[in-house]
């Protein structure tokens, strides 16, 4: 039986996504999911770290069946869902918190592989982490990731010059020059009617074809819940 442990996540915070009520707590709040109550040898286990989209909280992945989908296809994989809400991105502390509170301890614990997964803003966060610490992460699985504003990528569509001074959160100068070893770590899925379908498609062109999953759908959990199992099966 799967065991779920709630790590310092108040019920009130779980029930609200109002930005003004969110705080950037240290350490960042998490929910841990393991397959049994017995302490497993971490050297034989893998870890998936999940980042929610804007307006969602850590429990959203369990609610929509993602945790069960992961454990069905990867029975030796532990999962940590992170309460990585918008305030961490606004404060530019999301990468520091992920590394100090989750990834570095997981590396020290001896996990055989560490993956990141995220929806929407969480996909953006996964890419930010991979860019800064590529050696920490084996693969990332991103669903309909936010990839910046149109001003960041329109030049790729219009075949014009790139912006002279990219914004500090603009990933496109990196995304269009990904080294092969990084390309092979990225898996993306999105609905063809998603509001981010255009930039998602631009990223998909940078990746091996088998790393992309699409289906009819919009930017919502109805679509993502169907895409998650197929994306996980691609690795």
Sequence positions of predicted segments:
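Active-site nucleophile loop of the alpha/beta-hydrolase fold
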Residues: 141-150
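Short, surface-exposed "cap/lid" segments of acyl-processing enzymes
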Residues: 23-71
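Conserved alpha/beta-hydrolase
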Residues: 71-88
